[in-house]
Structure formats: C-alpha cells, structure tokens
Amino acid sequence: MLLVALALLAFLFPAGDTQNALQWPTSVHGIQISSFFNHTMAQSRCSGWLGNMELGSFDSDTGTIIFKKPWSKANFSNEEVLELEELFQVYMLGFIREVQERMSDFQMEYPFEIQGIAGCELISGGTIDFFLRGALEGLDFLSIKNSTCWPAPEGGTKAKKFCTLILQYKGIWDIMENLLTKTCPRYVLSVLESGKPDIQKQVKPDAWLSQGPSPGPGLLQLVCHVSGFYPKPVWVMWMRGEQEQPETQKGDVLPNADETWYLQVTLDVAAEEAAGLSCRVKHSSLEGQDIILYWGHSISIGWIILAVLVPCLIVLVLFVLWFYRRWSYEDIL
C-alpha cells in the first residue's frame, strides 16, 4: 500500500511541485449526523467528502449511495458499492436501535444529536492516517485510534461508559477496522486519480473593494472581497506600498454554491490615512500575477462612470419628451 501511495503522489504532484501538493485535498471522510427526537423517532444523515468537496451521500430510506460527481465511484465495482450500501444500512439501523435502547444507561434526554466523522488521509511520505471522532450536541465526545477508544474530557462519564461499552462489540470493531484500514485507503487513492481534472482545477478569483460600517468617529472600514477562487488556499492582505498592515482582519473562507470560495478581509483606518492603501491577493491560479486594488480608485472610477451616464440619460429623456410633444402637436394640426 505504501508503494502505491508513493507512486500516486508522484503522479499527482510531479517533482518540484510539493507546494501544490499542499493545496489539493488528500483526505476522504464520512460525516454522520443522527438526530433523536423521541424513543420512536430518529433520523440520520450521512455524506462523504474529499476535503471540502462533497462526493456523495447515503439515503437511509432507500439504502442507496448517491454519488455527486461522475468520478465519485472511483474504481469500485457495482457489486462492491452494493456491499457497502448493505453494510451502511445495517450499521445505521443498528446504531439507532442501540442508542435508543441504552438511553437510561447514559442518562440522556430527548431530543439530542450525535455527530461523527471518520476517514483516512494521504499524508507526506506516502503514508495513510486514519481517524474517527464522535461528538454529542456539538461537543467532543470520543476518538478512536489504533483500536483504542479515547473519551474526550468534554464527554465526562458518558464518554467513558461508551468507550467501555463499544469495546465489547467485536463485530463493530472488525467492521470499522476493515473500512478504515482497507476500504478507505483504496478509495482515497482511486478517487484522487479519477477526479484529478476536477480536484486540480484552477479558478481565478474576482476581487473588489467596498466600504463597511464605520467603526467609530473619523474611522473607515475598508473591505476587500475575494470570491470565486479554487483551490481554497489564498493570501489576502491590506498593504501600504510593500508594507503589510498588521491590523488586517480576515474572515473565514466560505464556500460558494459552485464549489469555489469566498473571503472578506477588512481594515479599520482613520479616514485621512486611507489614501495609498491597497488590497493584494495571491492565489495559485494567478501564477504570480497578484491582484492589487487601490483604495479610492474603484470609487473614483465609479463616480466617473456615474458622472458620464447621468447627463447622457437626462439628455436622452429630454429628447424623447421633445420628440413626443412635437409628434403629438403635428397630429393635432
């Protein structure tokens, strides 16, 4: 498996391209969210991801895997997919049943929600790491590593009891170990190859400036918007000349509907000091040609366009009115 992983890394990221290797997602993980409303009603949602790219989901009502990408199936045969569907269906039904039957053991009250994430990651050197973590109501509950269950401090006695309980289910351990150490590594290696054109696409960002709400008397909030870029890593900074402005505030990199990304970066500054500031954007798709937007230029250009358009529109309206009145007057005569 290690030799295969190293060969794939060499194929995906040729020599001298290690910086790009850090940009592309190399981990596959599944997310499970199970909501328990009462002792008879529960709902689970499961989805599979390559980094931040959704690959598919599991429909627990029909017991089928729904692939979101043409290449999401990777090199798995229809028979293998069917086996996974049956395994997931048995797991989901068993998980819900066990939780509901052991409510009193863990002193839990309805409604509540359990979240879980499990998967594997192709890391530097060609090795593959595995992970499984669980959360209760959004708080860390436990993690499983090397066939050992580790209760999280936030989980308290409930997490300790759960780890003690799950160790008794050898069948569950065997299934998890097989999925994490065999199925997942094979899948991540395959899907990275089959989805390479999409995974390694380059989409250039759009950038523009705006003014945010005033942070105080005599102050301006300068906002630099960067949107539509892929892959996710991006560098955005407010600058004065070549000097980075340490007061720059960066928001979270958020997903767009088309699987590109959006980032907003702000700077609070005295109004008289805004002149000469610029927003610089670095992204792999730009190939070293950084985007630089100067504060005031976009505003002045907008005013110039407005100053040209408004008089033209006024003249056009006056001409139409004059023509209409002249035409109406001639009809009367």
UniProtKB/Swiss-Prot annotation:
Species for this entry: Cavia porcellus (Guinea pig)
UniProt key word Cell membrane: yes
Topological region Extracellular: 18-302
Transmembrane region(s): 303-323
Cleavable signal peptide: 1-17
Ig-like domain: residues covered: 197-295
UniProt xrefs under CDD domains: IgC1_CD1
Coiled coil: none
GO molecular-function terms, A-Z: endogenous lipid antigen binding; exogenous lipid antigen binding; lipopeptide binding
Function: Antigen-presenting protein that binds self and non-self lipid and glycolipid antigens and presents them to T-cell receptors on natural killer T-cells.
GO BP, sorted A to Z: adaptive immune response; antigen processing and presentation, endogenous lipid antigen via MHC class Ib; antigen processing and presentation, exogenous lipid antigen via MHC class Ib; positive regulation of T cell mediated cytotoxicity
Motif (Internalization signal): 329-332
Gene: CD1B1
Top-rank taxon, per record: Eukaryota
Predominant localisation class: membrane
Cystine crosslinks: 120-184, 149-163, 224-279
Topological relation to the membrane, as annotated: Single-pass type I membrane protein
SUPFAM superfamilies registered for this protein in UniProt: Immunoglobulin (SSF48726), MHC antigen-recognition domain (SSF54452)
Localization per record: Cell membrane; Endosome membrane; Lysosome membrane
GO cellular component, one term: external side of plasma membrane
This protein's UniProt keywords: Adaptive immunity, Cell membrane, Disulfide bond, Endosome, Glycoprotein, Immunity, Immunoglobulin domain, Lysosome, Membrane, Signal, Transmembrane, Transmembrane helix
Regions of this protein lying in the Cytoplasmic compartment: 324-333
Protein name (record): T-cell surface glycoprotein CD1b1
Subunit structure: Heterodimer with B2M (beta-2-microglobulin). Interacts with saposin C.
Note: During protein synthesis and maturation, CD1 family members bind endogenous lipids that are replaced by lipid or glycolipid antigens when the proteins are internalized and pass through endosomes or lysosomes, before trafficking back to the cell surface. Interaction with saposin C is required for the loading of bacterial lipid antigens onto CD1B in the lysosome.
Annotated glycan sites: 38, 75, 146
